[in-house]
Design a protein with these regions (language model features):
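N-terminal chloroplast transit peptides
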Residues: 1-29
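Beta1/beta-strand and adjacent pyrophosphate-binding region of the FAD-binding site
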Residues: 43-59, 80
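Glycine-rich FAD pyrophosphate-binding loop
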Residues: 68-93
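Dinucleotide-binding Rossmann-like beta1-alpha1 core, especially the glycine-rich loop
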Residues: 96-191
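Helical element adjacent to the flavin cofactor pocket in flavoenzyme catalytic cores
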Residues: 196-260, 264-273
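Central helical "cap/lid" subdomain
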Residues: 246, 250-307, 336-347, 360-364, ...
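Active-site lid/adjacent beta-loop-alpha segment flanking the redox-cofactor pocket in flavoenzymes
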Residues: 297-401
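C-terminal catalytic lobe of FAD-dependent flavoproteins
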Residues: 360, 364-454
Length: 454
């Protein structure tokens, strides 16, 4: 990933100037305003710029990575991560891990090209960390070896005539870096023997990935640790990173201790009294079933793709797969544990959907289940977009721009987290909310008042 170029300035701050384009690739950097219009919170020789990141899932770790990556070399930086269950212990860690930039109708999502590009870059950074000699431990060697090893692609069968016509139209605008190929039944059978195509057509994304989300997040955190260590060695400043496994009960706990507090708590954001009931988020619990095949049976094809349909199948190995996911709206249950009754209901819902496309799944045996609570954003004309921005006006602290929200990733956290984490880090380091596209700030009732430059 390339470093963002900034001109050196005495305060060590970066001041982005928004261009007419809404994408990150067109954000340009200019000299800071004259000293008379800038109120420095501290000099580089005094205390470090202190950031608290609440949450260690997709959103939180992406922000941490980009804060470390983008911060000026001369800036002393301290980043503290707070998460009661540790790295990837929430909904991010149990997500299905199917990564691609398309809607169910194979239409490129809003800013899908940028999201896909930056996700690939962050995945590469985590992969590099996973093989680094600074990373290897007895615990990590077994689990982190290949969290992106399942490069099988993803197959989406057409399930009705109306759907198929729309899919065929959208295929024409797919990304060159994540192609969508139209397959007939024979071609699909060569990839995955036994797959059933109701309309003799399927859409195959060969570059789409199947990520082990929790292992990826653990590798990304290690990458952040390595980056902080290397930056402190090579630069004239100190970059400090710490993980605190403890609960956060209210934002006021951080008042006066940090220069920026970035809330990346997913569905748990409503547990903060300052934000409870004030965000346009809906909660939805999803259960994922874990299935295995007896060793003496022929396994899933080595290069067989994962499947997206009314239920999805994320292949973990020839004799292991994950099946998901249920949608229990308005749930407040964030526990990853699944009762036998909840698991039974999930299987009753998911297996018939999956067996319609892949009948062979009936031979697989249920071995366990896990669940997560999603924070779903409102639907807009551009789709369901995450919520980003300064929240001082929301929580009643308008004196300085220091409290930030990065939430509402819903079921697309793996796709959105890299690019939006990049944007959030820029906004935090520059104290300028305008870095964030207006589409991601439109959830706020009034125009933000958090454009203070320090």
């Amino acid at each position: 990933m390339k470093n963002l170029h900034v001109w050196p300035n005495p305060s060590g701050r970066i001041f982005p100037c928004r261009s007419t384009s809404r994408t990150l690739s067109h954000v340009r950097f200019v000299h800071p305003p004259p000293p008379s219009s800038v109120r420095c919170h501290s000099s580089l020789t005094q205390h470090p710029f202190r950031c608290a990141v609440l949450g260690a899932g997709f959103a939180g770790l992406s922000v941490v990575w980009h804060l470390l990556k983008q911060s000026p070399k001369e800036l002393n930086l301290r980043v503290d991560i707070y998460d009661e269950v540790g790295i990837g212990g929430g909904a991010s860690g149990i997500s299905g891990g199917l990564l691609h930039p398309y809607s169910p109708k194979v239409k490129l999502l809003w800013e899908g090209a940028q999201c896909w590009k930056e996700s690939m870059e962050l995945l590469r950074a985590a992969e590099e960390a996973s093989v680094s000699k600074d990373y290897r431990t007895e615990e990590s060697a077994e689990h982190m070896e290949a969290f992106v090893a399942h490069k099988r692609g993803i197959l989406r069968p057409a399930t009705d005539m109306k759907n198929m016509i729309k899919l065929n139209e959208n295929v024409k605008t797919c990304l060159p870096s994540c192609r969508v190929q139209t397959l007939n039944n024979g071609e699909a059978q060569s990839l995955l023997p036994g797959v059933y195509l109701p309309f003799n057509t399927a859409f195959y994304m060969p570059e789409a990935l199947n990520i082990n989300s929790r292992h990826y997040l653990q590798a990304l955190f290690r990458g952040c640790e390595i980056l902080a260590k290397e930056s402190s060695t090579l630069d004239s400043s100190q970059k400090q990173l710490s993980l605190h496994k403890r609960s956060v009960h209210r934002l006021s706990e951080f008042e006066g201790e940090y220069d920026a507090v970035i809330v990346c708590l997913g569905a748990k954001v409503n547990m903060l009294p300052e934000l409870s009931g004030r965000l346009p988020l809906r909660t939805c619990r999803g259960v994922i079933a874990q299935l295995e095949l007896h060793d003496d049976m022929k396994g899933y094809p080595e290069r067989g793709p994962s499947i997206l349909s009314d239920a999805w199948i994320a292949v973990q190995g020839p004799h292991s797969l994950n099946l998901g996911s249920t949608w229990e709206w308005k749930s407040v249950n964030s526990s990853p544990n699944v009762s036998s009754d909840e698991a039974s209901k999930a299987l009753q819902e998911l297996l018939p959907k999956a067996s319609t496309i892949y009948p062979g799944i009936k031979d697989w045996v249920f071995t366990g289940a896990r669940a997560g609570l999603r924070a779903m954003p409102p639907l807009t004309t551009l789709g369901s977009l995450p919520l980003l921005g300064c929240i001082n006006d929301v929580i009643g602290r308008n004196h300085i721009c220091k409290y930030w929200l990065f939430g509402g990733l819903g079921s697309r956290g793996l796709l959105y987290h890299a690019w939006l984490g990049n944007l959030m880090a820029q906004a935090v380091l520059s104290f300028n909310e305008e870095v964030i596209p207006s589409e991601l700030r439109s959830w706020k009732a009034t125009e933000p008042k958090c454009n203070v430059l320090f």
